[in-house]
Every structure is written in structure tokens, then in C-alpha cells.
Amino acid sequence: MIENITDEIYYHINTGQKLQIGDILEIGKRFNNFYYEIYNIEHIEDNKDANQYLIDMKKEKNLLLNNDTLNLVFKTINDSAMITRELMFEEVRKELNPNLPSRLKCLYVCKTKNEIKDWINIFSRTNKKDFQIVKLKLTGNIFTGDASFILRQNISLNRKKKQAKMYWNGEKKDNINEYLFIGTAVVEDILN
């Protein structure tokens, strides 16, 4: 479930502030970039959110969406589902084992370069294009979960909670490994 590691090499896809060789990161005390981004996201266009656009369209019986409005609605639905998922997973983590690394404060890492390629593929679907691949030396605690439990977002809260329990209990479904790290990370190399 949770493993204590010392000076082990892992890789990270960094989408935040650019890192340099020798940087030392203390992970686990504050929100990570992923959670900070989704927690602070707002989708508003012309002082309207997606719900207001949909309400107006229904009132006017005009169900045609222009591309900008469609993108706004899509991003709102997707991000709302993601936030709901993360909050559910955090609630379940606290219930089952609060000593496991929080998805909200951890550093997501990969064990191999092949796993990095798989995650870059997943990232490409979210339009994250500006990133660094960094090689890290890690000392701390690491949890291995199966990310296939988190990839489907628009499911019932009940099903989401069941998936969260399976994830935090270390069950395997499709073996899409996801490593959650808290502790000290030293940047050994920048690979791109």
C-alpha cells in the first residue's frame, strides 16, 4: 500500500513553475499544482457561466450553441466532474487511512520512462502541452494506485465512492499505475 523509500529514482511530468537541476522540493505540506488549478478554476464568459447560458437557451427555445459557448459548457462539466471526483477520493482517503498521501498535496510520479509516455498520452487529451519531464531522487512515502479507477468522471457519486475505496485499498483493474509521493524530491535531471 504505502512504501517508505530512500534516494529512489522516479520521473515527474512538471506542468508548474520550471524546475532546475539541484532544486529540492518538500512535498505534502501544501496543495499541488493540479489541485490548485482545478480548485481555482472559473468558467465565465460575458459575465455568464455555463448554467446561465443553458437556462437562457432553454427559455428562448434556442438550442444552438456557438463554438465558444459549447467549449465553456464542456469545460465546466469536465472540471466540475474532476473536482467532485477529487473531493470524493479525498473524503474516502481520510475515512480509510489518513496516513496515505493526499491526491491534493502529493507529487504524481512515474517509475519508468515508459510510464511517462503513457501519462503524456493521457495529458495530450487535456491539452496540457507545456511541461518538463524531470528525473527525481525521492525520499519519503509513496502510494501506488490504479488510475483506471479515476479516469471515468461522469458516474454516480455512489459508484465514484466505490471506486475510491478500491483505489485506496490498492485494488487493481487495468494496471494504470499512479504513484503519489510525499517527502523530499531532488531534481537530478531535466529530460526535455
Regions found by a protein language model. Name each.
Residues 2-9, 14-81, 102-105, 114-127, ...:
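Conserved NAD+-utilizing ADP-ribose enzyme module
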Residues 79, 96-97:
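Hydrophobic alpha-helical segments, principally membrane-spanning helices and signal/leader peptides
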Residues 83, 90, 98-111:
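Extracellular-facing segments of soluble proteins and assemblies that are Gly/Ser/Thr-biased and enriched
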